[in-house]
Curated annotation (Swiss-Prot):
Cofactor list: FMN
GO function terms (MF aspect): FMN binding; oxidoreductase activity, acting on NAD(P)H, quinone or similar compound as acceptor
Broad EC category: translocase
Protein name, as recorded: Na(+)-translocating NADH-quinone reductase subunit B
Organism this protein belongs to: Pseudomonas aeruginosa (strain ATCC 15692 / DSM 22644 / CIP 104116 / JCM 14847 / LMG 12228 / 1C / PRS 101 / PAO1)
Subcellular location, principal: membrane
Length: 403
């Protein structure tokens, strides 16, 4: 018996009046994930398109894979480099992860397999925790509201996991995704009705609730007892010269060979997925261009102003592009169609606001070198207001033209 026949055979148990009626959203989620939905539009107007929400969300999910797989490799590579330089740290490690890594691979920084296994031992538990806990809330709210489980959670779960450091405790992962899904999306009605990006809401909650596990120099590698600064922390302490002094070149930063959140280090891997999103028009090029223009303009402004006490004023825009979560936020977070502006002009303004805000936070606030997360959430709050004024300006322009 084929899987399609099996699903059709048990479907009546989940329909209204069936034995498992309350679990219909879960059945529907499995069915529509594996096969194309059979429902069609029955009233006017009819729109025929080659893409629907399911396909769009799966494409976004797949576009995170370059950043995901490179992130797993880089987590392992950074850890194995530390072990190669300080063998005594390796003997001090314990726990089930290192027992698993020792059984499946080694600790050679030059081995692709060893680095991937090491990184997977940290990323996959985080992702599975995110998916299971967040999926539980999605199914629960879908069952209560009696509507289908939306594929959008595939995107929320992977984006949230990729923004976390490898050393994050799994219970904090569960708490963060619960906060993001429930208070960032479901309380507003679910997918399509939230005005904040739920992945960023969960990440912001963890950052402010548990700063010791979300920031500082000790959280960016999977090695217990080792502390290493990110490129942005190095820049905040001594500018670009300090980054170069630690042996990190611009190309290293662009490729992602540095410490940081699991999916945010490689600008190249992020741009590979971003190119697909832009070519398929799932991501708005206007938002991406607006973010870049806002960031570059503010960077030149701060470069011109200068500061004897704050080295971040002199940091060029092309270094801002490859450090921290700027590229990841610009491609995957800012372009969220639900929480971003919807008008064409509004998208330019929305993106520019993010670019300006991230520079203000990074440069002017020396205690907080990263700013992409807060900049996007801030712009999310203003997106409806931006669209309102754009629409009102358009109405006034038409009235003036037509008398």
């Amino acid at each position: 018996m084929g899987l399609r026949n099996l699903l059709d055979k048990v479907e009546h148990h989940f329909e209204k009046g069936g034995r498992y009626e309350k679990w219909y959203p879960l059945y529907e989620a499995v069915d529509t994930f594996l096969y194309r939905p059979g429902s069609v539009t029955r009233t006017t107007a009819h729109v025929r398109d080659g893409i629907d929400l399911k396909r769009m969300m799966i494409i976004v999910w797949l576009c995170t894979f370059p950043a995901m797989f490179f992130g797993m490799y880089n987590v392992g590579h950074q850890a194995n480099l530390i072990f190669a330089q300080s063998p005594d740290l390796l003997s001090a490690q314990d726990g089930w992860r290192f027992a698993l890594i020792g059984a499946l691979a080694g600790f050679d920084p030059n081995s692709l397999w060893d680095c991937l296994v090491q990184g997977a031992a940290y990323f996959l538990p985080v992702y599975l925790t995110t998916f299971i806990v967040g999926g539980f809330w999605e199914v629960l709210f879908a069952s209560i509201r009696r509507h289908e489980v939306n594929e959008g959670f595939f995107v929320t779960s992977v984006l949230f996991a990729l923004t976390l450091p490898p050393s994050v405790p799994l219970w904090q992962v569960a708490l963060g995704i619960s906060f993001g899904v429930v208070l960032g999306k479901e309380v507003f009605g679910g997918t399509g009705k939230n005005f904040l990006n739920p992945a960023l809401v969960g990440r912001a909650f963890l950052f402010f609730a548990y700063p010791a596990q979300m920031s500082g120099d000790a959280v960016w590698t999977s090695v217990d007892g080792f502390a290493g600064a990110t490129s942005l922390s190095l820049a905040a302490a001594g500018g670009v010269d300090n980054i170069l002094g630690h042996g990190l070149t611009w190309m290293d930063a662009f490729l992602g060979h540095m410490q940081g959140s699991m999916g945010e280090t490689s600008t190249l891997a992020i741009f590979i997925g971003g190119a697909v999103l832009l070519l398929t028009r799932i991501a708005s090029w206007r938002i991406v261009a607006g973010v870049m223009l806002g960031m570059v303009a503010m960077s030149y402004l701060f470069n011109a102003i200068g500061s004897a006490s704050n080295p971040m004023f002199a940091m060029p825009w092309y270094w801002h592009l490859v450090t921290g979560g700027f590229a990841f936020g610009m491609i995957f977070m800012a372009t969220d169609p639900v929480s971003a502006s919807m008008t064409d002009t509004g998208k330019w303004l929305f993106g520019a606001l993010i670019g300006v805000m991230v520079m203000l936070i990074r440069v002017v606030n020396p205690a907080f070198p990263e700013g992409m997360m807060l900049a996007i959430l801030f712009a999310n709050l203003f997106a409806p207001l931006i669209d309102h004024f754009v629409v009102q300006a358009n109405i006034k322009r038409r009235l003036a033209r037509n008398g």
